[in-house]
Amino acid sequence: MLLTIDNVLTEEELAAASSLLAESAWVSGLVTAGAQAAKVKNNQQLPEDSPQMAALRGLVLGALNRNALFFTATLPKKIMPPFFNRYSGKTNHYGFHVDNAMRMLPDGVGYVRADVSATLFLSNPQTYDGGELVINDTFGQQSVKLQAGSMVIYPSSSVHQVTPVTHGERIACFMFIQSMVRDPNQRRLLYEMDMALLQLRQNIGETEAVVSLTGTYHNLLRQWAES
């Protein structure tokens, strides 16, 4: 399932993130690339020891914690601390690749299984040319280029790339989510049921049938979720 979520960051949060990123120093994006990805990755990344990293991560995670659509679509069990990357000049693209299934936490203690990948755009699309996130999966090929502050989520098993940025600068935040529901088809069914329940409540209220169907949703989640 591919899903876009608008306005994950408020205007104030986006301005704060932009200010922090403007003060940041960047390093080669190869620091987090696996063996396959290293052959096609050509961008820059904010290093772990960046003075701005903690504030930026706190800002993004705080926004995700209050976003109901992000929760129902990903059902997060663990969220890998977000990373930040930049595409511009000669470091301007990332060829087709698949994200590693297991991601080591930045502190080196433990792993996160990458079930869902997410990109939070931090540059407005009018400010750069190229830089589309192209994703191939069972839903076909999708090209994504969103307004700053908006996010796309998609299965981490998807083959994807960032096309060359030929003018301007593309800055984004990316992260990996381990879901309580590992199977993407089960996760999609739960999302669709939750959205249908939301629409039913708006249309007809908390009827007996809606309450019963809500119980079915939670029983399915109880059956499929990992503790």
UniProtKB/Swiss-Prot annotation:
* Cofactor(s) the protein needs: Fe(2+); L-ascorbate
- Alphabetized SMART domains for the sequence: P4Hc
Gene3D superfamilies per UniProt: q2cbj1_9rhob like domain (2.60.120.620), Rabenosyn, Rab binding domain (4.10.860.20)
Q: Which PROSITE patterns match?
A: FE2OG_OXY (PS51471)
User: What does the note under cofactor report?
Assistant: Binds 1 Fe(2+) ion per subunit.
Q: Where is the Fe2OG dioxygenase domain?
A: 78-179
Task: Supply one GO BP term.
Answer: DNA damage response
What Gene Ontology molecular-function terms does this entry list?
A: 2-oxoglutarate-dependent dioxygenase activity; iron ion binding; L-ascorbic acid binding
According to its UniProt record, what is one Pfam family this protein matches? PKHD_C
Q: Which UniProt keywords apply?
A: Dioxygenase, Iron, Metal-binding, Oxidoreductase, Vitamin C
* Record-linked InterPro entries: Oxoglu/Fe-dep_dioxygenase_dom (IPR005123), PKHD_C (IPR041097), PKHD_hydroxylase (IPR023550), Pro_4_hyd_alph (IPR006620), Pro_4_hyd_alph_FE2OG_OXY (IPR044862)
Q: Which residues bind Fe cation?
A: 97, 99, 160
Binding positions (2-oxoglutarate): 170
The lineage's top-level taxon is Bacteria
Give the Enzyme Commission number: 1.14.11.-
Entry's HAMAP family?
Answer: Hydroxyl_YbiX (MF_00657)
Write the protein's name: PKHD-type hydroxylase Neut_0373
The source organism is Nitrosomonas eutropha (strain DSM 101675 / C91 / Nm57)
Q: What is the lineage of its organism?
A: Bacteria, Pseudomonadati, Pseudomonadota, Betaproteobacteria, Nitrosomonadales
